[in-house]
Design a protein with these regions (language model features):
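Conserved N-terminal catalytic core of the sugar/cofactor nucleotidyltransferase
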Residues: 1-12, 20-22, 26, 34, ...
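A structural signal for short hydrophobic beta-strand segments in well-ordered beta-sheet cores
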Residues: 32, 152-155, 223
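Conserved alpha/beta core of the MobA/IspD/sugar-nucleotide pyrophosphorylase nucleotidyltransferase superfamily
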Residues: 2-10, 174-244
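A short, conserved beta-strand element in the Rossmann-like catalytic core
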Residues: 66, 120-123
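Cofactor-binding loop segments of dinucleotide-utilizing enzymes, especially the Rossmann-like FAD-
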Residues: 15, 63, 118, 143-144
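Short beta-strand-to-loop acidic/aromatic patch adjacent to the donor-nucleotide binding site
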Residues: 110-121
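Conserved core of the sugar-phosphate nucleotidyltransferase
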Residues: 122-198
Length: 244
């Protein structure tokens, strides 16, 4: 299990409605749906395969109704300490990028920031990821994928990201749901620019396209290839994963 050498903010936006699960009769909210005996969000955090010591600022953003319904003290054991933060929202936002900005006062600084989806798992070497992160302003873990269900990063010959597109296949490198920034303040800056320009995909402000504003500003964004990515985001995805 990897120990972090530097401080880092790790943020999980989990403030959606999970309506597709609700429509199919699931009674738990998506992050708390059982995945082989543990809540989905626990599987996602444990998938990092990291020791969460005082070098981490762990932040979760959830709906107030979910915080009231579930016992968040389970995260004491999952994370291994009680120094994490929970930001509660009264209602859903207009997309995950806007949700993450609700923690602006925590992440708008020079600390590295990694945001991660609450419904994706990966096979990867996280130590190699963080070694690579030291060389870039941002890094996007990716896997080889196809179809328009994912977001994609297109790179130049030198390996730097040229463009990121949400729900549109512009390459065969699909993003794995984890997004690293060497400074959290960069994410805040470029996410706010994207929202100010009202640049949406299917009506929402997604996280992956924020890198486009960083690229336009001359930031060096790299791609880190993971071995495999598993989506748990829909009832069909979850069943496929559990049966795999």
């Amino acid at each position: 299990m990897m120990k972090m050498k530097q401080t880092c903010n790790i943020l999980i936006p989990m403030a959606g409605r999970g309506s597709r699960f609700e429509e199919q009769g699931y009674t738990d909210k998506k992050p708390f749906i059982d995945v082989n005996g543990k809540p989905m969000i626990q599987r996602v955090i444990e998938n990092l395969n990291m020791e969460f010591d005082s070098n981490y600022e762990f932040v979760m953003i959830c709906l107030q109704e979910d915080f009231d319904k579930y016992d968040f003290r389970i995260f004491d054991d999952i994370i291994g300490h009680t120094e994490y933060k929970v930001v509660c929202l009264e209602d859903v936002t207009e997309g995950a990028a806007q949700t993450i900005l609700q923690a602006k006062d925590i992440i708008d600084n020079d600390k590295p920031l990694m945001t991660m989806n609450s419904d994706q798992l990966v096979d990867w070497d996280v130590e190699k990821l963080f070694e690579m992160c030291e060389q870039f302003d941002g890094v996007i873990p990716c896997f080889y994928g196809d179809g328009n269900a994912w977001s994609y990063a297109r790179t130049l010959d030198n390996g730097y990201v040229q463009e990121v597109a949400e729900k549109k296949q512009i390459s065969n490198t699909a993003t794995a749901g984890y997004y690293y920034w060497s400074k959290g303040s960069d994410f805040v800056k470029y996410a706010e620019q994207m929202i100010e320009e009202n640049s949406r995909t299917n009506g929402e402000f997604y996280v992956a396209p924020v890198y486009n504003w960083a690229v336009l500003d001359g930031k060096r964004i790299g791609v880190f290839m993971v071995d495999k990515c598993y989506s748990l985001g829909t009832p069909e995805d979850l069943k496929e994963y559990l049966n795999g």
